[in-house]
Amino acid sequence: RLGGDMGDLEARQNGGMSSPNKDDQNYPYFTCELGGGMIPSYHRRIYMYPEDAYSMAIVKLGSGSNLLGYYMYHGGTNPDGKTTYLNETQKTIATNYSDLPVKTYEYQAPLGEFGQKNPHYYTLRKLHLFTNTFGETLAPMEAYFPMKDKAPKQGDDSYLRWSYRSNGDTAFVFINNYERLQTLTDKKNVRFDVCGTKFPQKGMTIPSGTMAIFPVNIQIGDISLKYATAQIIYKDLSNVGRIRLYMQKIDGIESEMNINGKVLKRVKPLNETTPIYSSEQVDIYLLTEKYANHLGLQPENKLKASKVNFSKVKDAGPLRTITIGINDVAEQPEDADFEDAAIYHISVPSHNSLLDI
């Protein structure tokens, strides 16, 4: 399936959108083209926010998907064709929607065209750590949609969008209070009732823009985590004899945890070396978003500022005449148009030599 709203199959069954294929439930729920980004075209310069990709992945996972497939996860570069360029244009037959760049396929993806890490690389990485650690528990779980009786309606912001996946005893609660280009309201006095567990003890507010995964009735070593209003991220088993459980405090939500029957309230985040709770077998760490986004990553070598020299070789000629393509939008320049373009010589330091462009 492609991207969509939480519980999209259930929603269609309840009168929204088109009817599902009768055989949909007979196949594993995998995704193939979650929007890791979007490539800008000549006439439509789309900007993708990091939250767009992260929220969609949480929504699909919470809707029952057991495989998160992206288009694209890593940007690329168009190869050269034998007789033409291979970018999509209004003039190509099969893909004549927009004019795309000749060479770059910089998709605003988690990893850029040259491997640079964009902000949603770090947020999606947390989700991938979670699925890697808890995948065997999550995969056989059914998806449940407490708000399934409310068919999706454009502009309806009257209730919290959430689901949970459960095997009857253990569960993960998926929350999405984010929508691209919209500002959803804070959802107040929220309590969940999942697998016979009601939490938190008092109603909480889910701020606008919140995306989170809360655990319910998770057994880890000698710790019974009945619930937590903090996002579960990763279970580290690399240290023989001890288990490290990493969680993230969600901005605007107090972290409340029920551990072995004891309720911890307003738990403050520390760092990845200082646990907020320890038992004989388990250390629990609560991290800020910044720490969680870089959990386990080595400090990166930062780009050092270098002096870039440039000089003008040729002034620009007259402006080109903008033509309208077959889709009634502006066409990108042809090769001949660049004959009148200005030319600059740029010298960029590259290791022990100069890279001339």
Where are the model-predicted features located?
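Structural beta-strand/beta-sheet cores of well-ordered domains, especially the beta-sheet scaffolds
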Residues: 27, 67-69, 103, 169-171, ...
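Acidic, His- and aromatic-enriched active-site or binding-groove loops in soluble protein domains
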Residues: 1-4, 94-106, 170, 175
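Structured loops at beta-to-helix junctions and adjacent beta-edge loops in soluble globular domains
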Residues: 35, 74, 108-110, 165, ...
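Glycine- and acidic
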Residues: 37-43, 107-113, 240-242
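Non-catalytic C-terminal accessory domains or segments of carbohydrate-active enzymes
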Residues: 116-357
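Short C-terminal domain-edge/linker segments immediately following a structured domain
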Residues: 59-65, 101-107, 202-205
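Catalytic-core region of carbohydrate-active enzymes that cleave or remodel glycosidic bonds
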Residues: 2-97, 167
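Aromatic-rich peripheral "rim/lid" segments of glycoside hydrolase catalytic domains that contact
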Residues: 79-135, 139
